[in-house]
């Protein structure tokens, strides 16, 4: 596995965002939503869901907005790493609350990691890098006190990589007290969370109509502070040309994932701003170690060099 953070200069991997005039207190976003399978952070693994989940949920740590190569505390107040023991002892912010008003507890962190690994949806491979599997995950997590949780891993990875993994959307912390009562058939509330939210993010779900729209409203109690907007409406607009037209007409404030031709057509238009935003990524390389014709593939030194 290679951990890579994409810089701004890698233009082919950076999405452009176009912003026009915004109606008071409401942001209207035009983008495609047809790829969404679920908005449960333990299952969300498509572009549109990954773009939405961080508005609804937070992690103990997250990439810094201005420099994605750095990790910043969000629900965590501080942490201590023990490379030899392969542990992170994380102290949570004592005043952190979910949108429900419930406090963020070590139990919520443990529940969130256990459910993500046990559900074993498509994004679980990220947490598997730590050596976490359904059969061992419970033994890797421990409540130390009312505001402290210890995270352990069995894989041969550094605390720095462990923190980066815990900053990804699948490591989002959900409100156990809200989710657990909505569980059915041992699904950890997965079916319920496809249409609802239970996080501490800047916004909370008001309504989600698959293939139509997502409506989020401000979470005034978010640990990172209340957002400036009262609501966000994300409309499903599959066609990039239509997204561009909505921007030009002032019917949308933001359009995501426009093609190069759409961006070129908007460059220099009055009242329109094109933005390129860097983001953190993890890239994985797979080597065919069974290839007898190429012994390099089974050489660990080659893996590291690649």
Regions found by a protein language model. Name each.
Residues 28, 105-112, 146-152, 201-202, ...:
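Alpha-helical secondary-structure segments
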Residues 30-83, 114, 121, 198-200:
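N-terminal lobe/hinge region of extracytoplasmic solute-binding protein
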Residues 34-50, 72-75, 102, 156-172, ...:
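A structural "hinge/loop" feature
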Residues 77-123, 150, 246, 296, ...:
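Aromatic- and charge-enriched surface segment that lines or borders ligand/interaction sites
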Residues 91, 129-181:
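Surface-exposed binding/hinge segments that line
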Residues 167-227, 231:
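Gly/Pro-rich hinge or "lid" segments in bacterial periplasmic/extracellular proteins
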Residues 191, 219-265:
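Ligand-site clamp/hinge motif
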Residues 264-276:
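Ligand-binding "clamshell"
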């Amino acid at each position: 596995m290679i951990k890579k953070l994409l810089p701004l200069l890698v233009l082919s991997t950076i999405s452009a965002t176009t912003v026009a005039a915004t109606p008071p207190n409401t942001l209207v976003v035009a983008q495609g939503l047809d790829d969404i399978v679920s908005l449960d952070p333990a299952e969300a693994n498509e572009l549109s869901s990954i773009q939405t989940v961080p508005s609804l949920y937070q992690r103990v740590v997250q990439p810094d907005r201005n420099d994605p190569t750095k990790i910043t505390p969000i629900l965590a107040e501080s942490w201590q790493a023990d490379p030899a023991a392969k542990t992170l002892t994380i102290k949570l912010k004592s005043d952190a609350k979910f949108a429900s008003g419930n406090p963020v507890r070590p139990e919520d962190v443990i529940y969130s990691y256990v459910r993500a690994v046990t559900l074993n949806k498509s994004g679980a491979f990220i947490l598997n890098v730590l050596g976490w599997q359904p059969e061992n995950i419970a033994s890797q997590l421990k409540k130390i006190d009312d505001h402290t949780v210890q995270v352990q891993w069995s894989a041969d990875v550094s605390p720095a990589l462990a923190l980066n993994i815990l900053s990804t959307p699948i490591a989002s912390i959900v409100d156990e007290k809200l989710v657990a009562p909505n569980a059915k058939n041992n699904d950890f509330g997965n079916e319920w969370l496809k249409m609802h939210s239970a996080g501490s993010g800047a916004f909370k779900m008001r309504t989600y109509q698959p293939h139509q729209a997502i409506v989020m409203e401000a979470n005034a109690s978010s640990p990172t502070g209340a957002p400036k907007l009262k609501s966000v409406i994300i409309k499903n607009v599959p066609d990039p040309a239509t997204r561009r037209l909505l921007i030009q007409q002032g019917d949308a404030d933001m359009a995501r994932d426009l093609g190069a031709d759409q961006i070129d057509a908007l460059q220099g238009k009055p009242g329109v701003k094109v933005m390129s935003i860097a983001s953190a990524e993890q890239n994985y390389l797979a080597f065919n170690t069974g290839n007898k014709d190429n012994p390099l593939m089974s050489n660990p030194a080659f893996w590291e060099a690649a």
